[in-house]
Amino acid sequence: AAQGLIQRMPPDLLRLGLLGGLLGLDGTAVGQFMISRPLVAGALVGWAVGDMELGIGIGAVLELYILVSFPTGGARFPEGATATAVAVAVAAPFSGAGAVPLSFAVGLVWGQVGGASVNAQRHFNSLLIPEARSNTALSFPPGISHLIAIAVDFLRGSAVTMTGVLAGRLLIGSVIYWWPLPSSASTGLLLVGGAVSVGVLLHDLGGFR
């Protein structure tokens, strides 16, 4: 049954799930080599789906949207790597003016889902901290706890990415032909949104002085 389920999956889904897990790890758990930034993640996912130009383009614009979020403290923020991976992977199989903007919207929404999953994982990780042991805490040696947290983060990133790609492709496939704008207007719409995000960032930093 499991083999049949795998055979019915889109051929690139497992590959995207693996990449989503690695990008999720780079966010905080392992490395922080910045490959989880939208621009880099977009290029990697674009390569994985066979359209690096698409990946770089979506990643570059998403970078403008994500720059306004400063992931500090325990606040919840959209996960840029998840948003980018889902947006690029959802857009890749489709053509037409609506493919990128609709996939972009799906990616932004799923970035919020990714952010919520990070918060849930932080709660799980708190149960692994030796100093915070209580009746509900899990009892593992520190080294094992660290490995468990890394494995859970990888699985979280993979699961969120795969479900986002599946849901996004199903949604876009049913509504893409209703998209009313031509390609030039669609691109302009995304860039205007990015410009607004950059304006908010500049305002928060004090603007031009």
Segments from the language model and where they lie:
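Alpha-helical transmembrane segments in multi-pass membrane proteins
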Residues: 15-20, 38, 42, 46, ...
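Long, highly hydrophobic alpha-helical transmembrane signal-anchor segments
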Residues: 64-106
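Hydrophobic alpha-helical transmembrane segments
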Residues: 23-25, 46-48, 66-69, 90-95, ...
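Hydrophobic transmembrane alpha-helices
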Residues: 6-77, 81-82
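C-terminal transmembrane helix-loop-helix hairpin of multi-pass membrane proteins
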Residues: 14, 147-209
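Helix-loop-helix junctions within the multi-pass membrane cores of secondary transporters/permeases
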Residues: 100-177
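Helix-coil boundary and interhelical linker segments in multi-pass alpha-helical membrane proteins
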Residues: 6-14, 45-56, 90-106, 174-180
